[in-house]
A protein has these predicted regions:
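Bacterial Sec-dependent N-terminal signal peptides
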Residues: 1-27
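Compositionally biased intrinsically disordered regions enriched in Thr/Gly
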Residues: 21-271
């Protein structure tokens, strides 16, 4: 009964799309793709503007809350001080004329931000917000990567413009940032096709550091466009990607489908 009440409370409080997950157990990664819609939320809520979401979630239970807290703090630090790239985030934001007025994190606002942020972001428009959310986690055997996607989005007059996407991958055992990927794209790029390419590129390139036998970044580029061009549904394509990335051995995948994007060096992940 208590769980039901908690669920109802969460549903009541959240104005955003609901993510429905299928989980076999804590060790198995299930993948859910859902697309939010442009919508106007009541003015008395925390959400002051139109929000658009195209979210990818790898719902894997995080057992170590201390690690999660460390990762969250690193995310805040990286946004304001650019710890994980040579060109800091404030410079990138400045390039696009941004002021970071609000941070949306995993569908909730972060209230604790650096007091001196105006020193870094004193040049923007209050109608613009910086939006990022958890993209997902992928597990390979005993190694776990916590992957976070965030991007610059401008909201003006109900319209939104997407300027760039960034990814961080954290080792969930140490909270160490192990990989960073910049994806600056044209705002008119098909977002769905872009996301399957981006997340696949990150997963592969991050894992490639530890497991060179799984393939190359270039080969994944070819593979991702093969998936798109063969008109596989994004849900199915991402499900396959998630199973592959975590090294799932028990999943049944048609061999013809696997051949679309698996090099000979990758096939052992499905055997």
């Amino acid at each position: 009964m208590r769980n039901i009440l908690v669920l109802l409370l969460l549903l009541f409080l959240s104005p955003l799309s609901i993510l429905f997950c299928q989980k076999k157990d804590d060790s198995v990664l299930s993948f859910v793709l859902y697309q939010g819609e442009d919508f106007c939320v009541p003015s008395d809520t925390l959400f002051p503007n139109f929000l658009y979401q195209l979210n990818f979630e790898f719902p894997v239970k995080m057992h170590d809350e201390d690690i999660l807290c460390k990762i969250q703090q690193q995310l805040i630090d990286s946004i304001f001080y650019g710890h994980y790239q040579t060109t800091s985030f404030d410079s990138v934001a400045r390039l696009h004329g941004y002021r970071i007025d609000t941070i949306l994190y995993s569908n909730t606002y972060l209230r604790e931000v650096p007091d001196d942020r105006d020193e870094y972001f004193d040049y923007g428009n209050s109608d613009r917000i910086y939006f990022f959310h958890i993209c997902g986690r992928t597990v390979y055997n005993q190694d776990s990567l916590y992957i976070v996607k965030y991007h610059y989005t401008e909201y003006k007059g109900g319209a939104h413009h997407h300027y760039g996407t960034h990814y961080l991958a954290f080792d969930t055992r140490t909270a160490e940032c192990v990989h960073f990927l910049d994806v600056f794209g044209n705002e008119y790029v098909d977002h769905e096709k872009r996301m399957i390419y981006d997340i696949g590129s990150l997963v592969l390139s991050a894992l490639y550091d530890k497991y060179p036998e799984i393939g190359s970044f270039t080969r994944w580029e070819e593979a991702s466009f093969t998936i798109i061009n063969d008109n596989l549904t994004l849900h199915y394509a991402h499900y396959i990607l998630a199973c592959w990335a975590m090294g799932e051995q028990d999943i049944e995948i048609p061999i013809d489908t696997a051949k679309l994007f698996l090099s000979p060096n990758w096939k052992h992940l499905f055997q």
